[in-house]
């Protein structure tokens, strides 16, 4: 019975319109900035004694940029800003987001060492099938992406393809698409390539295959309840009887390396009219004749705090999320995430050693600071380095210690600062272990790293025999190797 209920719940929100698609289509009905608009208010470079210890990736939607909420971004607490979005049509053409180019955001991000990612979207299953399977159209799309990256000095691409038409497209065509993209962009391995994936769908999606050809996956761990839901409930339940963020990461993504998972979290909530004051109450459809229209509206975090905290706030122990209720000739409920529930999700990312967390969406918190303070609390470590001239200027790979070793050893290396420009602020780093014949044994580091001194604890596989092994560091054109002795 539990399996049947789980399948029903997963199927329900799998066919629902995602927050990415819904907001994009809704905002198009409103006024937007003309092509070529540039907001002249530039963000200043932030000099702080903070260093992120995990990826903090945020989507910045064009409507939040148009409204000026990008001016509240704290760049020193972000590693990536994903411009949302460049829309792909069925022929491989790209439409820029309104107001493009966002020169103020790009300049401010790069001056603070933040990577700027272009998000390429399509929400039409037939169009996506054509983009993924037609060689000519696919290569045209890749070339348009490449030109955009080069022309605007961007640092990578995030593919957000939703509503794929069938299991074959999810399981096979999407993986082949990413494999071809990785091959197409081999000319510049520093470009990050990533894919936005659903929280559930292991039976239909090949998450491990997508991860193999991506630097990371942005797991959209929200929209568990939404406009389509027949009961109230959390957008992102940390825990739950059948479906939850925790279950998604542990079970649905069990075959994906944890360092390739970004845990997406919501900076928004949902508002319903209901038939009772109880959690998970039956909802009164806003429009009973329209699909995906059961709730009243989406509420950005800033709107929840501004307009609804005057009402009774409660905590749902089932999902570990807050909710609000009030009665005005009928019951109303708002379910959302706050700093308390988000901290629990961040703890999950830390405990599971995930690559980091991701935000839908930047700007949704307005000028409030509590969610930024939470990121600082969970994902930064103090550092005395506040000026570029104090950062290392040379690559170094140090001898491991202890050596010989068993069961583990420490490896240290440095990534330098290069005053020639922002491109050197974060560099692609690999640290691998090989046997004496050159066979790869372990991947210790495979990530983008900011300038600094790094210390890694290496524990070899249990089956590794006694012997001499080589650990090799690669950063751009720089390569260094050293030997170590493992005694079993």
Predicted feature locations:
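Short, compositionally biased serine/threonine- and acidic-rich segments at solvent-exposed termini, linkers
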Residues: 381-388
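Substrate-binding surface in catalytic domains of secreted glycosidases
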Residues: 90-100, 143, 163-304
